[in-house]
Curated annotation (Swiss-Prot):
GO terms for molecular function: cytokine activity; growth factor activity; interleukin-2 receptor binding. InterPro entries: 4_helix_cytokine-like_core, IL-2, IL-2_CS. Gene3D superfamilies: 1.20.1250.10. This is Interleukin-2. GO terms for biological process: adaptive immune response; positive regulation of biosynthetic process. It comes from Bubalus carabanensis (Swamp type water buffalo). GO terms for cellular component: extracellular space.
Length: 155
């Protein structure tokens, strides 16, 4: 009598696991990754906002796109990934004591790695960008706010 219910429960569990339904351990890993991404973005923002770099006006003239809608899901990280290459190129235009090319590359590689891990196998999402653009500081602030929002919903 209970065989059918048990088999249904097992089948449903397997289907959820196969489709990547979050488990408590994956949620814990996701929280750690989001926290790491948040810290990396904050560190990058500190370097960009450094008064020494503010004198390098070229870096602060470039525009970046942000998603048209408020980014609220991990799939929106694809939009960050698409703009990250431009940010790296812009930061390399203005080398200074606290923005050396090696550190920039390491930081960007780490951010890319984390974003790719958080995205998982999500490939069907297409970013829609706002018509208005933002400068580097505001761009980083928006993604920091995104990470804080995601992190707070997971706790």
């Amino acid at each position: 009598m209970y065989k059918i219910q048990l088999l249904s429960c097992i089948a449903l569990t397997l289907a959820l696991v196969a489709n990547g339904a979050p488990t408590s351990s994956s949620t814990g890993n996701t929280m750690k990754e989001v926290k790491s991404l948040l810290l990396d973005l904050q560190l990058l923002l500190e370097k960009v906002k450094n008064p020494e770099n503010l004198k390098l006006s070229r870096m602060h003239t470039f525009n970046f796109y942000v998603p048209k809608v408020n980014a609220t899901e991990l799939k929106h990280l694809k939009c960050l990934l698409e703009e990250l290459k431009l940010l790296e190129e812009v930061l390399n235009l203005a080398p200074s004591k606290n923005l050396n090319p090696r550190e920039i590359k390491d930081s960007m590689d780490n951010i890319k790695r984390i974003v790719l891990e958080l995205q998982g196998s999500e490939t069907g999402f297409t970013c829609e960008y706002d018509d208005a653009t933002v400068k580097a500081v505001e761009f980083l602030n928006k993604w920091i706010t995104f990470c804080q929002s995601i992190y707070s919903t997971m706790t």
